[in-house]
């Protein structure tokens, strides 16, 4: 099993500049047989993301979604020099 660690060579996505807690799920959308999640950033912009996209500042990868939630797994430091752990998080659907 590979060690858990963020990929330093991966190009960051737009929503990774915001803290996880500042992002809000505001809806879902199905277009061309793809299910999308609508996420609102703290500046008021609404973004279309799907499973596999990243958001938040802790390498948060979207791993699942439903009509009322987005499941994310972040990679965060475990407090040691080179140690990392996975931390599951959820964003629930909120009102506009």
How would you label these PLM feature ranges?
Residues 1-96:
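Extended low-complexity, proline-rich intrinsically disordered regions
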